[in-house]
């Protein structure tokens, strides 16, 4: 508890020193994963509308929070003009921290930690964003990427989740080289097996050949879809795969609730359904999908409510939702979209 109070005070004192680039969406007010994904999709769709292909690289940094070099972090704080007294507090805190591992009833002996920001710390997200901000600066300095108005956008970040964008293969490889060099200097290790490239082709570029791309000397796999921030992005910018992901999530949540809370009253089950089954992550971003995919989601949403309340499948879904005071899928989706654009 005392450590959280101290971190809260330090975070308030550091606020004006640790502002990061607009490309970083993580742990910022009025930002989030959905806004980051939306920005990525809008950029790609704009370029495809102008008959230009776009290369997207989703880069995975292995245990990035655990690999932060303390000395380099404190150097960055000093370069930002952070008071020396605050840096000394952080340096002493990190140098003298120790951890223990609990496994069942066994507890290991204490051991020191030489790298990484504190797990669960209030200050840790801000320190990590600052640690990675120089990578954002170096990528922006490349001046290659997607031109939006008078601004070049070649990457988007949410904490350690990085996506790079470029309409040219040479520019794309240049961005990968910048990431590689930054990783070497700042102890950031990339996982090439979990990093991938998507080529969102324009209609006229269907037969165009693209070269191989390399990150940290390893060849990157070219995929037709990738999961970025929990949302499926495909080379055709279709949302069908993500809707099917949501169908699977709904059934998993409903079965879990039905199994664990089968003895509860219907009122409790309805509250649980609202809490676990109605968020529909990234639903406001769905704009390009087949009717059959949305029909499957409709069936899944209705089925899950019936499963939880132990009601036969042939019962009327619309009447069921009205009587329970729960939004239908169409009403829920509309409300989520209004909330996302700031009208709800």
PLM feature segments, named:
Residues 1, 5, 9, 13, ...:
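Amphipathic alpha-helical segments in well-ordered regions
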Residues 1-130:
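Conserved pre-catalytic core of RNA-dependent polymerases
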Residues 6, 10, 14, 40, ...:
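Mobile genetic element proteins and their domesticated derivatives, centered on retroelements
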Residues 49-51, 154-157, 224-225:
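Short, flexible turn/loop "capping" segments at secondary-structure junctions
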Residues 105, 189-224:
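Short, conserved micro-motifs composed of acidic
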Residues 64-80, 155-185, 201-204, 235-238:
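Catalytic palm subdomain of template-directed nucleic-acid polymerases
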Residues 159-160, 191-196, 200-202, 225-344:
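Non-catalytic, peripheral interaction segments enriched in hydrophobic/basic residues
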């Amino acid at each position: 508890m005392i450590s959280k109070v101290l971190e809260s005070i330090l975070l308030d004192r550091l606020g004006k020193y640790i502002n990061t680039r607009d490309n970083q969406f993580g742990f910022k007010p009025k930002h989030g994963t959905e806004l980051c994904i939306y920005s990525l999709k809008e950029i790609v769709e704009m370029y495809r509308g102008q008959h230009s292909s776009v290369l997207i690289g989703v880069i995975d940094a292995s245990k990035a929070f655990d690999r932060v070099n303390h000395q380099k972090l404190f150097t960055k704080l000093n370069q930002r003009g952070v008071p020396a007294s605050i840096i000394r507090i952080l340096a002493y805190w990190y140098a003298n921290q120790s951890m223990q591992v609990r496994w069942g009833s066994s507890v290991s002996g204490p051991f020191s930690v030489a790298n990484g920001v504190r797990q669960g710390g209030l200050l840790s997200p801000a320190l990590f964003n600052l640690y990675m901000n120089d990578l954002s600066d170096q990528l922006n300095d490349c001046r290659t990427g997607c031109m939006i108005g008078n601004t070049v956008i070649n990457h988007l970040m949410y904490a350690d989740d990085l996506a790079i964008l470029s309409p040219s293969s040479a520019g794309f490889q240049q961005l990968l080289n910048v990431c590689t060099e930054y990783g070497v200097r700042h102890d950031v290790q990339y996982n090439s097996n979990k990093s991938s490239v998507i080529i969102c082709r324009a209609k006229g570029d269907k037969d165009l050949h693209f070269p191989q791309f390399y990150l940290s000397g390893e060849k990157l796999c070219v995929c037709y879809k990738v999961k970025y921030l929990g949302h499926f992005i495909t080379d055709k910018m279709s949302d069908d795969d993500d809707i099917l992901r949501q169908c699977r999530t709904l059934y998993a949540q409903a079965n879990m609730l039905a199994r664990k809370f089968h003895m509860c009253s219907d009122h409790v089950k309805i509250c649980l359904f609202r809490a676990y089954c109605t968020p529909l992550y990234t639903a406001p971003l769905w704009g390009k999908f087949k009717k059959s995919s949305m029909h499957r989601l409709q069936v899944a949403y209705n089925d899950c409510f019936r499963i939880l309340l132990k009601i036969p499948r042939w019962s009327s879904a619309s009447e069921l939702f009205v009587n329970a005071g729960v939004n239908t899928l169409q009403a829920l989706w509309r409300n989520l979209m209004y909330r996302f654009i700031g009208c709800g």
